[in-house]
Amino acid sequence: MTIGTITSQVNYRAALNTLWASLMLEELVRMGVKQICIAPGSRSTSLTLAAVANNKLTIHTHFDERGLGFLALGIAKASQEPVAVVVTSGTAVANLLPAVAEAGLTGEKLVLLTSDRPVELIQCGANQAIVQHDIFSQHVTAFHDIPSPTLDISPAWLLSTIDEAMQLQQRQGRAIHFNCHYPEPLYGDDVDFSEYLAPVSEWKGDELPYVSHQQALAPHIAIDKRQWQSLTQRKGVVIVGRLAPEELGQVTLLAEKLGWPLLLDPQAGGSSAWAGFDVWLQNASCQAFLQQADTVIQFGARIVSKRLLQFIATSSIEHYWLIDPRAGRLDSTHRRSSRIQAPIGEWATCALSLTENSEHAGWAMPLQVVSERYFEMLGEYSDQLTELSLAVNLGAWLPDKTELFLGNSLIIRLLDMVGKLPSTATFANRGASGIDGLIATIAGINKARQAPMVGLLGDTSLLYDLNSLALLRDVSQPVVIIVTNNDGGGIFDLLPVPALQRDELYRMPHGLEFSHAAAMFGLAYYCPESLPQAEEQCLYALTQPKTTIIEIKTPAGEAGEMIKALFGKVKNATLL
């Protein structure tokens, strides 16, 4: 059909909208997108119908765009693949910002396909029209404003624009944003566009991207053998932040070969014989002992422990190496350092092959004894059901291959202070470290991993993302949400906020519990009254292919008082 014949048809614009959407999605598929998250909307009809027509895409839906963004974030986090997101125009787009900001800091690859009014309807009083141009600003790796589909622009431009942004994302990570202007009509019959598509006929006949990018040099791990072997003869520490699943094993082997202490953040996916360092580093003798180290090798970023960050910032470190696959600055202490961008597991394996016996192997073994004595002290906190006893005991409750999601605010800090976590895939949103979107993120991880999962979060976090429980109604593996309900923001009990305004303006007690929320979404619910009962209910829930909420109710302020008492005891104890 000729272009003149096409434009004479009443609804050709609707068909052209869908054609452009189909071209975009097909090229995204060829560039590695397998899953797409869609919220309802009329302006996004072309993208939605194109997704349905593409049998290489798995579709996930949610009625709330903020939750949808975090759902996609969870899928991308767990699969380590790009995930597409489709929303309609207006504030639907703005609701993606929290998830986009998180991905901007932690590197998950989101492909945002936002629908927009045509440019002539922006800032003129038209309905559901806001300024969406570059709305995510510096939080995204690339932004492209896709004009209203027109036969005057070759489909080759559209495909090559997709390829350019996706190639940039492959190198830098984070979200990329295509803002797509769709004029009405949005609904119509198919039209023959064969003449218009002639310039990309070869592309249509294969399954390759329109533009194939190749690096001149294949990426490889390069470590200066002489420099590394000199470094390994020092007193060093191996610090581990956020890791991808299955990377901890290689890092642990390297630390063992070096004979250096291994300090693991909760996001690392396990614990070591030096666990509890966030607390025992408050003991002056222990702190002084660790400060003998003049070398730090850090794998992964986003460290939770303030005490560990203070050690990095203030100790007399001569050599600080930070290895992470993501680009950008990841050292908030601004130390002079060697910043290595590389896959962590591969780099650790390469370093291990170059590592000889270290002169100072085992130098920090006394700190293992410190850790043992510290955990003996925690025994007195294990007889009652409290947030502290939950954090102390949780690791022992989890069957093999049960994965973890750790919420923000108080709970992840408690696990860092007193927990011993099992070796398992462990996830968290520790970029912006917000309490929003945690349930939706858990749902996304669950969809990608298809493994039993326990998510731990606080009551305010659950209230913040309550409607995302809808995403957990239909699961194929056990999902257990353990919510610690201390009636508000318990983290503020540990911060020097004004005492007179602590409740009213910081903790904000709500007086709510979650049994009715569980019932509303058809989820199982337990509220244990003792620590053994909590363990029993958790273990049972992990045998059921459904979602269970376990609510741990504790008095407001209790956790803060217990932590302060523990800190005082450890500071004054003889641990070395």
Swiss-Prot record:
Q: Which cofactor does it need?
A: Mg(2+); Mn(2+); thiamine diphosphate
Q: What is its EC number?
A: 2.2.1.9
Q: Does the keyword Metal-binding apply?
A: yes
Q: In which pathway does it act?
A: Quinol/quinone metabolism; 1,4-dihydroxy-2-naphthoate biosynthesis; 1,4-dihydroxy-2-naphthoate from chorismate: step 2/7; Quinol/quinone metabolism; menaquinone biosynthesis
**Which Gene3D superfamilies would you find in this protein's record?**
3.40.50.970, TPP-binding domain
Reaction catalysis annotation: isochorismate + 2-oxoglutarate + H(+) = 5-enolpyruvoyl-6-hydroxy-2-succinyl-cyclohex-3-ene-1-carboxylate + CO2
Might you name a Gene Ontology BP term for this protein?
A: menaquinone biosynthetic process
Asked whether the keyword rRNA-binding is assigned, the reply is no
- Which UniProt keywords are listed? Magnesium, Manganese, Menaquinone biosynthesis, Metal-binding, Thiamine pyrophosphate, Transferase
UniProt GO MF annotations = 2-succinyl-5-enolpyruvyl-6-hydroxy-3-cyclohexene-1-carboxylic-acid synthase activity; magnesium ion binding; manganese ion binding; thiamine pyrophosphate binding
Cofactor comment: Binds 1 thiamine pyrophosphate per subunit.
Q: Which family does it belong to?
A: Belongs to the TPP enzyme family. MenD subfamily.
Summary of the function given for this chain in its UniProt record: Catalyzes the thiamine diphosphate-dependent decarboxylation of 2-oxoglutarate and the subsequent addition of the resulting succinic semialdehyde-thiamine pyrophosphate anion to isochorismate to yield 2-succinyl-5-enolpyruvyl-6-hydroxy-3-cyclohexene-1-carboxylate (SEPHCHC).
> How does this chain assemble?
Homodimer.
Q: Which NCBIfam families match?
A: menD
Question: This chain belongs to which protein, by name?
Answer: 2-succinyl-5-enolpyruvyl-6-hydroxy-3-cyclohexene-1-carboxylate synthase
- State the organism named in the record: Photobacterium profundum (strain SS9)
Its taxonomic placement starts with: Bacteria, Pseudomonadati, Pseudomonadota, Gammaproteobacteria, Vibrionales
* Gene name of the record: menD
